Regions:
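Conserved N-terminal phosphate-binding loop of PLP-dependent enzymes in the Aspartate aminotransferase
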Residues: 1-136
Length: 136
């Protein structure tokens, strides 16, 4: 019959690395940190949503967060999303974009992010969003 195989299946080294990664995630409480910092970010982003009409939605779980950027008529604002993404990069904060119309800002920081880093991210994003009012 057909033999099933996997490149990494059963490799002692791969298994050892996987075990160590899981141990670090547990020992450093990275899941708890993702929830705590993620909740903080989502709360802060929802505050920004209340101040900027072009934020249509904030959604996510843990540290996987999306911010929908829209036009006044509710349609996808692809160009504005690209502008925000590039301005954040100019400020040395790497974020991405996604979605069928590429109008969702994607925030996926490392599991080790601290609250101080999240505060800086929100402050920088707020400044960039204020600048959008001049850009449009």
């Amino acid at each position: 019959g057909i033999e099933f195989f996997s490149t990494f299946g059963g490799s002692n080294l791969s298994c050892r690395i996987g075990t160590e990664v899981l141990k670090i995630v547990d020992d450093e409480k990275l899941q708890k940190n993702a929830k705590t910092v993620g909740d903080f970010l989502i709360s802060g982003l929802n505050e920004l949503k209340n101040n900027f009409e072009f934020i249509g939605d904030v959604r996510g779980m843990g540290l996987f967060i999306g911010i929908e950027i829209i036009r006044n008529d509710g349609s996808e604002a692809t160009e504005l999303c690209a502008y925000i993404k590039n301005k954040m990069r100019e400020n040395r904060i790497l974020i991405g974009s996604d979605g069928p119309k590429d109008n969702i800002i994607k925030i996926r920081p490392p599991l080790t992010i601290e609250l101080e880093d999240a505060e800086m991210l929100l402050a920088t994003l707020s400044e960039v969003l204020e600048g959008v009012l001049d850009w449009t």
